[in-house]
């Protein structure tokens, strides 16, 4: 009895599937044959019942699912396709146009299957048009832009008129689409899978919509679409720069002027970095133009292959190494990532592999491989991975020399398999191949006591530079910043090798740049002049509560002197300002009116002179007009007030 009942359902299924012709056709599927072990997979009926039910029970609706393994239309990865005879509500979207003329019009059963791709998190509806072999049409759930979907199969004018008759109500297709979505979630929960991500369609002006409506852009993920207005191309993630700027790429002088707006001092380092970045992306641009042209070079000299030149920055902490690299990446608009060399270990040990650096770069590039292959990688604290001194310890140096050896091919240029999910390498995991030959690597480090190695190499401890260095080392143990900077300018590869870097690692950095320690005057300029100056940052922070912030010239001098004593460079300035302004920032958020309202905060000589005792705080002026009264009482020719014009975001200095 059970066999007869199954045979009857199979005949009905084949009869209806043969009579269906798809109206919407986004993606077509044709499977010539399916493995026998995947042909039938039976599930119990949702409504219960059996084959021998009595008259008191309704006829059971049995759902049979046939499993196939086609490729996903979006990501081309393998996915499971479940074909069932679940009955959906009929509509003009999924019902074939000439149902009214077909035999058995009263039984309008649409054989549907709602499927989910686990790789790209995309949901599809499946309309079959043949069972043996299985043929049908994919409909992407949530991406249908109109009640009627474009069809690739030519239809007659008669069927078109009948389709228009089915869609007289303009909201009919939209309402059915919502019903289809709700049915999809019910079916998906029964499969035990997680719902896909909510990917909104790209805006009309987005580059992703430049393709025809029935095509999907390649190498573009919906998460890369930013619907918010962007003021300039620097923050536009949908259009990367680098070699793509072509002849519009800034010249070294233009790059140096841009760096002057953000970094104080370091004129020689700015020139060297400007030339290095310009030559790097000019090489990539001309190489791509050469590959794109079909003409063969006449002279053999045109076939010269240009290698990249990585950069090694050396300088004390707070001198601007990281800021220089970050500002360069922002100017040329390429993906930029900062890696810490102290967290890297050799492959197979606890810690981050060197491939994790490329995965971070790929993440910043929104998984755009072409953009990531022209990015900038800054590896900080590279002086901390020097090899250990030879001793009785025979264990492997996995965080020192082992990391240097692992970085060799990465710096030179090779194809690296990056794990897709950022985990360690797995033989069966998905990998993304990245070519590092066009990635600019900038390494930086403080290289403490490197000047001692330079003095030993020069062998002039009695005269010249060696005499003051030896004298300072003998008396105080610390050399002056000017002498140290002069010695670092004459650094050579042999000095770095003696410091603990292996020769192969040093050879990957033909450009050696030394940065000098900031002077007291330069620290004062750091507080007021750059676009991202600390004084402007705190003034903007206070202005959010309608409170004015004022620095006197004497206070700026005292703050810079205290930062020089700390020997932490520009980083010490923020710590000092936080200590001085903490009490004011604690009181300001309280909403008070009248004489209790905070009108301004003053940082003067008295607020900064006792910083060493941790008892100094900025002066708080309360009441309307308190700031104007303070200015009139303390008017001085030498006092300056750095102010922030919020309308244009530029800095001004107003004489009080």
From Swiss-Prot:
Residues 216-226 have a biased composition (Polar residues). The lineage of its organism: Eukaryota, Viridiplantae, Streptophyta, Embryophyta, Tracheophyta. This is CLP protease regulatory subunit CLPX3, mitochondrial. InterPro entries: AAA+_ATPase (IPR003593), ATP-dep_Clp_protease_ClpX (IPR050052), ATPase_AAA_core (IPR003959), Clp_ATPase_C (IPR019489), Clp_protease_ATP-bd_su_ClpX (IPR004487), P-loop_NTPase (IPR027417). Residues 1-44 form a transit peptide. Residues 142-177, 193-235, 634-656 are annotated as: Disordered. It is found in: Mitochondrion. Gene3D superfamilies: 1.10.8.60, P-loop containing nucleotide triphosphate hydrolases. ATP binds at residues 316-323.
């Amino acid at each position: 009895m059970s066999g007869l009942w199954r045979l009857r359902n199979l005949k009905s299924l084949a009869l209806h599937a043969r009579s269906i012709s798809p109206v919407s056709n986004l993606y077509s599927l044709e499977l010539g044959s399916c493995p026998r072990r995947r042909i039938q997979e039976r599930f119990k009926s949702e409504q219960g019942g059996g084959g021998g039910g009595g008259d008191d029970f309704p006829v059971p609706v049995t759902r049979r699912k046939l499993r196939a393994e086609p490729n996903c239309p979006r990501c081309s990865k393998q996915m499971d396709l479940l074909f069932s005879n679940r009955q959906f509500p009929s509509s003009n979207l999924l019902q074939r146009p000439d149902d009214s003329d077909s035999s058995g019009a009263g039984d309008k059963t649409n054989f549907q299957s709602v499927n989910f791709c686990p790789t790209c998190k995309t949901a599809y509806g499946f309309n079959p048009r043949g069972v043996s072999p299985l043929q049908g049409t994919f409909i992407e759930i949530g991406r249908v832009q109109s009640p009627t979907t474009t069809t690739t199969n030519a239809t007659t004018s008669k069927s078109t008129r009948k389709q228009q008759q089915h869609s007289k109500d303009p909201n009919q297709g939209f309402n059915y689409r919502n019903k289809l979505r709700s049915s999809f979630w019910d079916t998906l929960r029964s499969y035990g899978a997680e719902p896909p991500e909510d990917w909104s369609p790209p805006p009309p002006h987005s580059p992703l919509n430049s393709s025809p409506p029935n095509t999907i852009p390649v190498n573009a993920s919906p998460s890369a679409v930013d619907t918010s207005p962007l003021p300039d191309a620097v923050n536009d993630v949908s259009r990367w720069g680098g070699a793509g700027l072509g002849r519009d790429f800034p010249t070294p002088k233009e790059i140096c002027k841009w760096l002057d707006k953000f970094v104080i001092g370091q004129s020689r380092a700015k020139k060297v970095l400007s030339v290095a970045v310009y030559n790097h992306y000019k090489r990539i641009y001309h190489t791509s133009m050469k590959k794109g042209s079909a003409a063969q070079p006449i002279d053999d000299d045109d076939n010269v292959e240009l290698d990249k030149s990585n950069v090694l920055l050396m300088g004390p902490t707070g001198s601007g190494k990281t800021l220089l690299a970050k500002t360069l990446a922002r100017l040329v608009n390429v993906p930029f990532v900062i890696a810490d060399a102290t967290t890297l270990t050799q492959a197979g040990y606890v810690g981050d592999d060197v491939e994790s650096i490329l995965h971070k770069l790929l993440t910043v590039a929104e998984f755009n491989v072409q953009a990531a292959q022209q990015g900038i990688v800054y590896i900080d604290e590279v002086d901390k991975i020097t090899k250990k001194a030879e001793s009785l310890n025979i264990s492997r140096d996995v965080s020192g020399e082992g990391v240097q050896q692992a970085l060799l091919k990465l710096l030179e240029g090779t194809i690296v398999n990056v794990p897709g999910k950022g985990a360690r390498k797995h033989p069966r995991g998905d990998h993304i191949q990245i070519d590092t030959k066009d990635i600019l690597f900038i390494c930086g480090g403080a290289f403490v006591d490197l000047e001692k190695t330079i003095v030993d190499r020069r062998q002039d401890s009695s005269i010249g530079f060696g005499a003051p260095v030896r004298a300072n080392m003998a008396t105080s143990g610390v050399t002056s910043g000017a002498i140290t900077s002069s010695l670092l300018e004459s650094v050579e590869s042999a000095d770095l090798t003696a410091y603990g870097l292996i020769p192969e690692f040093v050879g990957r950095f033909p450009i050696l740049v030394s940065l000098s320690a900031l002077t007291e005057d330069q620290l004062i300029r750091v507080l007021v002049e750059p676009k991202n100056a600390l004084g402007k940052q705190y003034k903007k922070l206070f202005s959010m509560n309608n409170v004015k912030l004022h620095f006197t010239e004497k206070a700026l001098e005292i703050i810079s002197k205290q930062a020089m004593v700390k020997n932490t460079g520009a980083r010490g300035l923020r710590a000092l300002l936080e200590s001085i302004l903490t009490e004011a920032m604690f009181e300001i958020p309280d909403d008070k009116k009248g004489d209790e309202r905070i009108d301004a905060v003053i940082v003067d000589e008295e607020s900064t002179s006792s910083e060493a005792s941790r008892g100094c705080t900025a002066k708080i002026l309360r009441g309307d007009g308190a700031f104007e009264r303070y200015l009139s009482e303390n008017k001085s020719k030498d006092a300056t007030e750095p102010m922030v014009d919020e309308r244009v975001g530029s800095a001004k200095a107003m004489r009080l």
